[in-house]
Amino acid sequence: VLTEDDKNHVKGLWAHVHDHIDEIAADALTRMFLAHPASKTYFAHFDLSPDNAQIKAHGKKVANALNQAVAHLDDIKGTLSKLSELHAQQLRVDPVNFGFLRHCLEVSIAAHLHDHLKASVIVSLDKFLEEVCKDLVSKYR
């Protein structure tokens, strides 16, 4: 559960992330494909080389979902409900991949915006991304 301090930290960080989120999300996807090759299964039709337009386009989708989650921190589950349903029912993505992407997002954010990451902000970011992952797998039951 995100505290008010967590929400404030996430919103404060996102003011800096927002301008770079498409790049960060594409970078995180590339990192995930390299670190967790099995995650490429769902993107067999993609050219997975870095800076590829397909990765950037999917990164933009990830970015949009994260922006929506930040905009609705009091209702992340409701905000991501349709996306959760899509991944669970239609795409049938193994939920472990959300955790992989979460970790890669944290690394990418740190690589791009390390000057804005104090320990308390990192903890809040981690809790936020955990909440996003938890809510994305909510329709798997």
Swiss-Prot record:
Tissue specificity annotation: Red blood cells.
Q: Where is the Globin domain?
A: 1-141
An annotated GO cellular component of this protein is: hemoglobin complex
Q: Which UniProt keywords apply?
A: Heme, Iron, Metal-binding, Oxygen transport, Transport
Query: Entry's InterPro entries?
Result: Globin (IPR000971), Globin-like_sf (IPR009050), Globin/Proto (IPR012292), Hemoglobin_a-typ (IPR002338), Hemoglobin_oxygen_transport (IPR050056), Hemoglobin_pi (IPR002339)
| GO biological process, any | hydrogen peroxide catabolic process
Q: Which family does it belong to?
A: Belongs to the globin family.
Q: How does it assemble?
A: The major hemoglobin component (HbIII) is a heterotetramer of two alpha-2 chains and two beta-1 chains.
Protein's name according to its UniProt entry: Hemoglobin subunit alpha-2
Instruction: Provide the species name.
Output: Varanus albigularis
